[in-house]
Structure formats: structure tokens, C-alpha cells
From Swiss-Prot:
Protein name: Peroxisomal membrane protein PMP47A
Organism superkingdom: Eukaryota
Subcellular location: Peroxisome membrane
PROSITE patterns: SOLCAR
Gene from which the chain derives: PMP47A
Transmembrane region(s): 12-32, 98-118, 148-168, 204-224, 245-265, 353-373
Domain notes from UniProt: Lacks a typical peroxisomal sorting signal.
């Protein structure tokens, strides 16, 4: 394993490039997973529309097959056939543009802040060597808790920063056929469309389960590090790239199984409008009120039920004080459990596991290949512009590119200044 020191921006650009390539290769699996997570709800909504459009009113909610639809398990093959029948092969790539934009930004932000946070923690834990040489402190590597802390910081920042992009991506993947206008927009236009029609809050729906998903890379890396240490101890050698690939895939497998319910919740919340969420919350409250005895004849039963659940009132009060995004997540989760069962949280898991493992493998490979290239370009640029001694200032690197362009001709310089003014 190489001990070469790489710049933070090198990791960021390599991660973004690796993410673009791996996402492009595995995106049809992403589409199948997203459809599997949300299709039951969409089919249920379609049945409700048919029920409401019934002129003679003979079809009651209880006698309809809505519940059957909500309980019906849809196979991945059926989903694939439906997509190909309705939209053709291009339907497997709905929302690809927004996904590529999202994964590039996510990986860039994640890897940049992961490396920056990790190196900061490393130097603070080794002040005596950090004061003498940066590389001496960094060769020791990060401890498990330092890696987890760096992953938590980087994951939180990247999730919050890119949540609007993934809301738009889910909409463009699932609803591009139903919402024709949305399907014709690019990512930025789709975000603006959602902002104008549903409000800025909608762009951050699913943020709570998204933040829970910060655990995914933390779990993956912890498993990876522990197994790596075990192999090094047993075989008395460093792990090979193939070892790292297999360990990373295994860590991703475990992390995805643990966090998949939150992935499903996030996808459901992305396609669910704010009014629908409010209606669900109101429905739960209405059902609770209607369950109370009307004439006092069931007062004894009510007391008996209250005695069985002495903490029910306390729990209700606690939930009422929670932030609305958390309440929305638990309301949606409870509704899924009640109507569709526990299996609804793991719908599409098999395809997601395949996609996640392949994506992690491709990402690992492409990132390592691009890392040397991006690091060479960035360090050469810094040496040419006199920034070699300040490797962590991204703003200065951007200015260095502008400076290099402005040195070509007065016309180029004018264009650069004008573009900067627009920004």
C-alpha cells in the first residue's frame, strides 16, 4: 500500500470522478431499487383515484382492493417489465443527469471534508511530529474513532448540502412520466420547480433519514478497518488492492442491510408531498379521537387499556414536541408498518445490495486510478502558481486557475473577471 501524501482536493476530485463513472455503470439498478421502494405507494394512489372516479359509488374503501394492492409484493422483474413497457430502455436512466450531478457534489464534499477533518485530528493527536513535518504525522494513519469522527463530519455536511439534489433526482426517476413538465427539466430547474410549487421545506424532506444514513460509511469503514487489522496480524503483510476491494464490498453489504430501512423512508418522503404528510398526521390524530368511547359505556375498557399502557400519554407528549421532520418520518414509518408490514422497509433490498457492492467496487477502482492523475495536476498547478506551501486552501487554488487564464491575453482576462462578477 502506498504511503504517498495526497492533497485534499485530489481526493475530492478523484472521488467525484469515481462517483460519476460508478454511478453511470450501475444507474439502472438504482432506478429499479427506487421504483421498488416507492411503487406500492404509487399503485395504491392509482387505486384511490379509480375508486374516487367510480360514478355509482358502489365501491367502498373497505370493499376495494386497495389494501390488497398495498400488500402485494412486486418482483424486480415485474418492475423492470413495467418500466420497459411504459418508457422503454431510456426509462432505466430517468434522472441520470441529476444523479450524476448529485453524486459528483456528494463525493467531492465528502472526500474533501473527510481528508481535511482526518488530517486535522491526526495532527492534533500527534503535536510533536506535526510541528516538525506534516508527512510524519500523517503516515501513522487515522485511528478507528478518528475515522468515524471524520466520516460523521463529512457525511453530515454532504447529506445536508445535497439533499435538494436527491429530492429532485427521486422525483425525476419515479415521476418523470406522470409529471411531464418535471421530466423535461434539468436538475437546477427541477429544484426551482419544486421550490415554487411546494416550498423550500420539500427540498429537505427526508433529511432526518438521510442524516441517519451517515452511519452507512461509518459502519462500512469500521468493518473494513477491523478486518484489515485482522488480516495484517494473521498474514504478516499489508492488504492487497484485491483484499481491500473484497473487504470494502463486505463492509458495504453489512452497512446497507443495517441502514436500508432509512433509505426506503427517504425515498418515500421524497415522492410524498407536504400535504400528504400533513394528511397522514391528521389521520392518525382523527383515528385516535374516533377510538374513544362516545357514551361512556366503554369507560371500563378505556381505563383497562390505559392501565396496560401507562406511558402512552407521556410518549404522545414527547412526540408532539419533536421537530416536524422527525414526526413525519415516524408517521410515515408507522403507516408503512401498519399497511404493508415489516417487509416494506426492505423492498428492493436485493437489487440495492447488488448496486451498492458493484458501486463500491467501481468507486474504489476508479478513485484510485484518478487520484494519482488529479493529484499530479493539482500539485503541478500549485507549483506553477506559487501555492505549493498552502495545500489546503481551495479558494487560492481557484484563484490560481483564474490567474493562469488571465495571463494568456487581455481578452481572456476580461472574460474571467466578467464571469467572476456574475457569480
Amino acid at each position: 500500500m502506498s504511503t504517498r501524501e495526497y492533497d485534499d482536493l485530489s481526493h475530492a476530485f478523484a472521488g467525484a470522478g469515481g462517483g460519476l463513472l460508478s454511478m453511470t455503470l450501475t444507474y439502472p439498478l438504482v432506478t429499479l431499487t427506487t421504483h421498488a421502494q416507492t411503487m406500492v405507494k404509487l399503485k395504491k394512489d392509482q387505486e384511490k383515484e379509480k375508486e374516487n372516479s367510480n360514478e355509482d359509488g358502489s365501491l367502498s374503501p373497505k370493499s376495494s382492493n386497495t389494501s390488497d394492492v398495498s400488500q402485494k409484493k412486486i418482483s424486480q422483474f415485474e418492475i423492470l417489465k413495467k418500466i420497459l413497457k411504459d418508457q422503454g430502455a431510456k426509462g432505466l436512466y430517468n434522472g441520470l443527469e441529476s444523479a450524476l450531478f448529485g453524486i459528483a457534489v456528494t463525493n467531492f464534499v465528502y472526500y474533501y471534508f473527510y481528508e481535511l477533518t482526518g488530517k486535522t485530528l491526526n495532527r492534533r493527536s500527534n503535536p510533536q511530529t506535526a510541528s516538525n513535518s506534516k508527512k510524519v504525522a500523517l503516515k501513522k494513519g487515522l485511528s478507528v474513532w478518528q475515522s468515524m469522527a471524520a466520516g460523521a463530519v463529512a457525511g453530515t455536511i454532504s447529506r445536508v448540502a445535497t439533499n435538494p439534489i436527491w429530492v429532485a433526482n427521486t422525483r425525476m426517476t419515479i415521476l418523470s412520466k406522470n409529471q411531464g413538465k418535471l421530466g423535461k427539466l434539468n436538475t437546477i430547474e427541477a429544484i426551482i420547480y419544486i421550490l415554487k410549487n411546494e416550498g423550500w421545506q420539500k427540498l429537505f424532506t427526508g433529511i432526518v433519514p438521510a442524516l441517519f444514513l451517515v452511519l452507512n460509511p461509518i459502519i462500512q469503514y469500521t468493518i473494513f478497518e477491523q478486518l484489515k487489522s485482522f488480516i495484517v496480524k494473521i498474514k504478516k503483510r499489508n492488504i492487497t488492492p484485491v483484499d481491500a476491494l473484497l473487504l470494502g464490498a463486505f463492509g458495504k453489504l453489512i452497512a446497507t442491510i443495517i441502514t436500508y430501512p432509512y433509505i426506503t423512508l427517504r425515498s418515500r418522503m421524497h415522492v410524498k408531498s407536504m400535504t400528504e404528510i400533513s394528511e397522514d398526521v391528521e389521520k392518525e390524530r382523527t383515528d385516535s379521537v374516533q377510538s374513544l368511547p362516545e357514551d361512556g359505556s366503554d369507560e371500563d375498557n378505556l381505563k383497562e387499556n390505559s392501565a396496560k399502557s401507562p406511558y402512552a400519554e407521556t410518549i404522545t407528549k414527547i412526540i408532539s414536541k419533536l421537530p416536524s421532520p422527525i414526526v413525519s418520518m415516524f408517521t410515515l414509518g408507522y403507516g408503512m408498518y401498519k399497511e404493508e408490514g415489516v417487509s416494506s422497509f426492505y423492498r428492493g433490498l436485493s437489487v440495492k445490495l447488488l448496486q451498492s457492492i458493484l458501486n463500491a467496487a467501481f468507486l474504489f477502482y476508479f478513485k484510485e486510478e484518478l487520484l494519482i492523475l488529479s493529484d499530479g495536476i493539482i500539485k503541478s498547478t500549485k507549483r506553477a502558481t506559487g501555492l505549493a506551501n498552502n495545500p489546503y486552501n481551495a479558494k487560492d487554488v481557484i484563484h490560481s486557475f483564474e490567474k493562469a487564464l488571465s495571463m494568456r491575453s487581455p481578452r481572456t482576462r476580461t472574460t474571467t473577471v466578467a464571469s467572476s462578477a456574475k457569480e
